[in-house]
Amino acid sequence: MPDYDNYTTPLSSRYASKEMSATFSLRNRFSTWRKLWLNLAIAEKELGLTVVTDEAIEQMRKHVEITDDEIAKASAQEAIVRHDVMAHVHTFGETCPAAAGIIHLGATSCFVTDNADLIFIRDAYDIIIPKLVNVINRLAKFAMEYKDLPVLGWTHFQPAQLTTLGKRATLWIQELLWDLRNFERARNDIGLRGVKGTTGTQASFLALFHGNHDKVEALDERVTELLGFDKVYPVTGQTYSRKIDIDVLAPLSSFAATAHKMATDIRLLANLKEVEEPFEKSQIGSSAMAYKRNPMRCERVCSLARHLGSLFSDAVQTASVQWFERTLDDSAIRRISLPSAFLTADILLSTLLNISSGLVVYPKVIERRIKGELPFMATENIIMAMVEKNASRQEVHERIRVLSHQAAAVVKEEGGENDLIERVKRDEFFKPIWEELDSLLEPSTFVGRAPQQVEKFVQKDVNNALQPFQKYLNDEQVKLNV
């Protein structure tokens, strides 16, 4: 039954995918602890600890997935002992009596908590990387589709030289490619804390193996292997260095900036009525203004991107204040910031997937806006054409300057249309180029190499970057909960 009397974060209850929510769920956390205890016991037995029996391992393996009743029992136990790990040690031991005496043998709490966090981080990156790949792929298709469509460029949000809609999309894609590189690097850099003991010296395991250093090292390597990792951090304190969390969250925060910029661009384009995010037939934009088509998905992206970007400072500050081998003031904030970061990144990517799959373009609006500004941009072309007809460059410049100011006054002071070209056509001075004016005002001649840049970028940079991820590419429609 839903619990309507307790607060739940909207990240999981409203927005995030079931897959990401499950990754950071209590069930997965506590079941992962059990997997860690199981694999520790397996490795200890393989290396000769006879106190670990086959029966103990079989019972642990059978009950590695924690039940609702066991979660409740451990929660009640934690209220008594004030230690979450020991509460679960006792609960697991009650379920697996043959293993009760060897669960957590030689380990400290961070064996399960830190190693589990590293597993969650790896798994979370494995969820968001395919989504990022598909966002890039869909935007690349959009860029190619509109590589030749001239649009008014904007600098300082003032009209500037023309570009193409496809070229504008490549600016988003390029930053997303950098994010993909950063995600992959962060994911592949993750190792395990491993089997290190209370202060990282492995003293407890050295005692278990009666001073046999080789077996302690073998234990560390075997547990790492059993958990599916190819590397373990060579030295730690009680915890793995919290600087690793910085390396984990930095790419996510950087991606947040990319997402915010892209969504902001689309929001501005929606105001200009040139490009809009998808809008469902039954979607309501405003409870009062029935005509509204608000860019609510892009607005959500901007909102959550600000949250994701802010979490990076949590990691930086936490890493900087860790004393010696560890302090516990990292614990509470990490329980919040790490899941929040990945849940938020997951939401952003799902939303961007939805947006990029259904962007709506209005070419006629784009064309009308270009026509309103292009005459001013074409003045240099007009000057050059007149000079080729043996006119004085300075005289042409002065005449076109006067006409441009008159046309600007019509636009700004009277609210009229830009009539510069009509003024040029009425001025006998410009008669030598009247027949050329239409060609001088062809928008495609003002976009430079934008179409060629799009083709080269997609065919070379994008395709090469996506080549290792072909198995993830799909055209599935992403449905958002809200």
From Swiss-Prot:
<feature type="binding site">
    <location>
        <begin position="14"/>
        <end position="15"/>
    </location>
    <ligand>
        <name>substrate</name>
    </ligand>
</feature>
<feature type="binding site" description="in other chain">
    <location>
        <position position="335"/>
    </location>
    <ligand>
        <name>substrate</name>
    </ligand>
</feature>
<comment type="pathway">
    <text>Purine metabolism; IMP biosynthesis via de novo pathway; 5-amino-1-(5-phospho-D-ribosyl)imidazole-4-carboxamide from 5-amino-1-(5-phospho-D-ribosyl)imidazole-4-carboxylate: step 2/2.</text>
</comment>
<dbReference type="GO" id="GO:0006189">
    <property type="term" value="P:'de novo' IMP biosynthetic process"/>
</dbReference>
<protein>
    <recommendedName>
        <fullName>Adenylosuccinate lyase</fullName>
        <ecNumber>4.3.2.2</ecNumber>
    </recommendedName>
</protein>
<dbReference type="Pfam" id="PF00206">
    <property type="entry name" value="Lyase_1"/>
</dbReference>
<feature type="active site" description="Proton donor/acceptor">
    <location>
        <position position="286"/>
    </location>
</feature>
<dbReference type="GO" id="GO:0004018">
    <property type="term" value="F:N6-(1,2-dicarboxyethyl)AMP AMP-lyase (fumarate-forming) activity"/>
</dbReference>
<keyword id="KW-0832">Ubl conjugation</keyword>
<feature type="cross-link" description="Glycyl lysine isopeptide (Lys-Gly) (interchain with G-Cter in ubiquitin)">
    <location>
        <position position="196"/>
    </location>
</feature>
<keyword id="KW-0658">Purine biosynthesis</keyword>
<feature type="binding site" description="in other chain">
    <location>
        <position position="326"/>
    </location>
    <ligand>
        <name>substrate</name>
    </ligand>
</feature>
<feature type="binding site" description="in other chain">
    <location>
        <position position="238"/>
    </location>
    <ligand>
        <name>substrate</name>
    </ligand>
</feature>
<dbReference type="GO" id="GO:0070626">
    <property type="term" value="F:(S)-2-(5-amino-1-(5-phospho-D-ribosyl)imidazole-4-carboxamido) succinate lyase (fumarate-forming) activity"/>
</dbReference>
<dbReference type="GO" id="GO:0044208">
    <property type="term" value="P:'de novo' AMP biosynthetic process"/>
</dbReference>
<dbReference type="GO" id="GO:0005829">
    <property type="term" value="C:cytosol"/>
</dbReference>
<feature type="binding site">
    <location>
        <position position="300"/>
    </location>
    <ligand>
        <name>substrate</name>
    </ligand>
</feature>
<keyword id="KW-0456">Lyase</keyword>
<dbReference type="InterPro" id="IPR004769">
    <property type="entry name" value="Pur_lyase"/>
</dbReference>
<keyword id="KW-1017">Isopeptide bond</keyword>
<dbReference type="InterPro" id="IPR019468">
    <property type="entry name" value="AdenyloSucc_lyase_C"/>
</dbReference>
<dbReference type="InterPro" id="IPR022761">
    <property type="entry name" value="Fumarate_lyase_N"/>
</dbReference>
<feature type="binding site" description="in other chain">
    <location>
        <begin position="82"/>
        <end position="84"/>
    </location>
    <ligand>
        <name>substrate</name>
    </ligand>
</feature>
<comment type="subunit">
    <text>Homotetramer. Residues from neighboring subunits contribute catalytic and substrate-binding residues to each active site.</text>
</comment>
<feature type="active site" description="Proton donor/acceptor">
    <location>
        <position position="156"/>
    </location>
</feature>
<feature type="binding site" description="in other chain">
    <location>
        <position position="331"/>
    </location>
    <ligand>
        <name>substrate</name>
    </ligand>
</feature>
<dbReference type="GO" id="GO:0006164">
    <property type="term" value="P:purine nucleotide biosynthetic process"/>
</dbReference>
<dbReference type="InterPro" id="IPR008948">
    <property type="entry name" value="L-Aspartase-like"/>
</dbReference>
<comment type="similarity">
    <text>Belongs to the lyase 1 family. Adenylosuccinate lyase subfamily.</text>
</comment>
<dbReference type="InterPro" id="IPR000362">
    <property type="entry name" value="Fumarate_lyase_fam"/>
</dbReference>
<dbReference type="Pfam" id="PF10397">
    <property type="entry name" value="ADSL_C"/>
</dbReference>
<dbReference type="InterPro" id="IPR020557">
    <property type="entry name" value="Fumarate_lyase_CS"/>
</dbReference>
<feature type="binding site" description="in other chain">
    <location>
        <begin position="108"/>
        <end position="109"/>
    </location>
    <ligand>
        <name>substrate</name>
    </ligand>
</feature>
<comment type="pathway">
    <text>Purine metabolism; AMP biosynthesis via de novo pathway; AMP from IMP: step 2/2.</text>
</comment>
